[in-house]
Amino acid sequence: MKKAAKIVLLAVLLALVGGIVYAVMVWPVNPTRMKPAESYEQLRDTVEKKTDIRVPGEDLLPWTVTERQLRMDGPSRLAKVSGFALSGTMEHGGVAFSAEVSVGVTGVVGDLPSPWDVYHYVPVYLFQNQGFYMTQLYIDGSEYIIQLHYPENVTLPEEDAAYIENTLQAACHDIIDLYS
């Protein structure tokens, strides 16, 4: 075989191997962009080491945490951590709630209502509907969201609704205090 043919064959083989390695590295391994964390400690250490995001304690809400996930900035093996989500359940007044605390890097999109609360100069927004409460706050370029869902056919008594709002407000204050 001539020397030129060997060089061309070697170049083709290297390109083929490079293409395969690239495909393996960018093939979606986390199509939902979420990756399970083995423990709270692993989640906190990973997020705080690789981002500027602070992770609140698991006792942020009166709940049982059932799932801990790292939010990734893409679906591939090369994706980097960009936030987290803690999910769980809580109960109050005989009503079961599913709860989630999540954070990711984002920018404010669209018009926001007037703040529900302002704590240490950070506005906190409350959205509520039948079966749903959500708070949202932006601090140091990160968007924190706390969501509580309950059955839509349940009407919360005033004192239970006040308890939920006070619990959400205290949780938001705890998150903001992490940055103080």
Language-model segment annotations:
Residues T106-S180:
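A short, solvent-exposed beta-edge/loop patch
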Residues V26-W27, T51-D52, G94, N153, ...:
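Short, flexible coil/linker elements and helix-boundary hinge sites characteristic
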Residues G18-R33:
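Membrane-interface motif at the C-terminal end of an N-terminal transmembrane signal
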Residues P36-L137:
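Short, solvent-exposed recognition patches
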